[in-house]
Amino acid sequence: MAGVATRAAWPAPTTAAPVLTFTLPAGAKRAVVSGGPPPQLLKLADVRPGMVGEALTVFRGTKPEPFKVRVVAVLKQFLPKEDVILIRAEDPRVEHSGIVAGMSGSPVYVDGKLMGAIAYAWSFAKDPLGGVTPIESMLAERARPRRLDPMELAASAGDTGARGLPALVGARPVGGALGGEGRLVQAAVPLSVSGFTARTVAELTEALGPVGLVPMQAGGGRRLTPGKLEAGHVEPGSAIGVELVRGDMSMVGTGTVTYIDGATVLAFGHPMFGIGESYLPLVDAEIHAFLPSLAQSFKMSSPLHEIGVLVQDRQTCIIGNLDGRTTMMPVDVRVTGPEGKTRAFHAEVARNRRLTPMLASMVVANAVADAEPDVTDMVASVDGKLALHGHAPLELKDQIFSTEGISGRLLGGTHGLRALAELMFNPFEPVVVDRVDVDVRIELK
């Protein structure tokens, strides 16, 4: 059945929906910062092979622990106009696991001076060699001014070119998550997901693997608990995450804090997506375990508290603000099975024109896969309702037939979810989608 756009009487147009604030909301608590004032810096020009120092990272829990490292060499022009410091870890824990996905951003100190952040590694490496982004390169990004209206970043107009996650692949400076044998590549960012089915995780891996994100199922996603505003904790070496989905489902990319100065936090030592100025929630995280692997060891983690907002996603680091908060887009899904029983799911997804359509599609697909997992002939009737900021809402209807259950790809092709992407990329004016409601009715054939 062809999808027909209709102006619905649901709900009233929204006239005020703040996307970003750099003043803590009433009742919110600022993250507790420890570790003292910013350390002295070791200039790249003073780095020499053979120097011995220590790095900080969380092996388990929330407390950073030191491990010994030794400088091997300085790799000139590793990236355009950027050098990388080659190090070797000399600690039994890291010699067993190698440089771990999730260790990105771990600060490295020599004689008490901050040299930089662990950011690069080899897949299938036999020795724990890694690359360090010099702190000078990271601090240079801190001076970059914010230029764009956050509302427009959430839904920018004028870009009708490549869209969504495939367009992000070109933004990565070096190889993906597991490729790159024989060359130094960005340490992957473990994407901790909970509340997702194995089928949806497989689709996430296919979509996000090329951009250096490794989806892995973990427990303890951060649920939405109104009125519970606990303070998080952050210090150099602690785990920090970029939250993409929260609620009944959770998706968080986890790395490590490198440097804190007032409300400014530098982390990762490389980009997450490489999309420049952007506004996504930051959380602190708990590390459950290191999972060693020949291909790519990684940290298993869960998010704890919202602590700030990502403001820059650049070549040498991500930059956050501890006083900032940003909103996410609610997605409510109701799935009614053949027997008439309805299951409801609530999640919130990050506001970013390249991310939001994919994340919303995954939330809807996961809800359907969880509520009706049968891989058989079925018809899904989909009613999608988009509440638009300052405009009348939009309602679209679809019917899908599949012989192998309802997948994320099929749902992503429905008119409602396609309209979400088209609205965010429309060339006429920025459109902010306040929320998405999807009703799915399943019939077996």
Predicted regions and their residues:
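Terminal presequence/propeptide segments associated with secretion/organelle targeting
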Residues: 8-445
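Sec-dependent N-terminal signal peptides
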Residues: 1-8
